[in-house]
Amino acid sequence: MITIRDLNHLLVQVHQEKITEPDKLRDPFIWGDVFLKELNRNPNQMILHIWPMENAVILGMLDRELPCFASAKQTIEAKGFYPVVRNIGGLAVVADEGILNASLIIPDNMTEKISISNAYLLMVELIRTSFSDFYQKIDHYEIEGSYCPGNYDLSISGRKFAGLAQRRIKDAILVSIYLSVNGNQNKRGQLIADFYEEGINNQQCKIDYPQVVPDSMANLSELLDYPFSLAEVIERLHLALRQLGFELTTLNSHSELMSDFKELKDKAFLEKNA
């Protein structure tokens, strides 16, 4: 199995953006595909993409199969949130000013291929390193009652604070994390619980949607008893990568990247309005 230290010969390029406008909610997912394409062209690097949002609910593609999907989206909008469907695995998650969204884009061109579980464990290792000065153990297993449940839910004392998703294009892998840093996590859980209650509406579903229990989740500030800001957590990610032997630099959005982004954004716009 490959550990994150095995990759520290790669330069980490950091791209950070904050999404505050509803018409830019798809931008991080477009950038994700741009970065996957870039690592297929130039695999001698990794990319750390930091992309917090405000007042958004990121939906999975399977959420569109809800019997009453349209009215479920309206429950989100009625509470002042904007729904957006992502092109990566998983189900609905909240993305507000207390949630850190980040992606690690990794080349998969070594002799030993990086399996799906191995890729997730690279992110787990990064998060554990980022908070290694705290004594609390960070576990990874599915937390029943959480939203967007999965085998790589990150939790402390049985309460989930982060979840992972993954996307692959050829020889590049993107592992994303949403991490509840601060704010009212119980309110976030109730928002998603209400979304599924309205979306299912007592009807039969082919998909096993989660029965969300808000108290199954908490934010990192509560679990570690420290008032983290998003900026502090981002700095911890940077520091952890340096501790693991990586060199970091700010991503240069060169013309080829910008051209790829424009092409994919134009395509997404046409598909949305088709």
Region spans (language model):
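Beta-rich nucleic-acid/ligand-interaction surfaces
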Residues: 140-161, 258
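Contiguous, small/hydrophobic- and glycine-enriched helical/loop subdomains that border
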Residues: 100-102, 106-144
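Aromatic/basic-lined ligand-recognition segments
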Residues: 158-166, 174
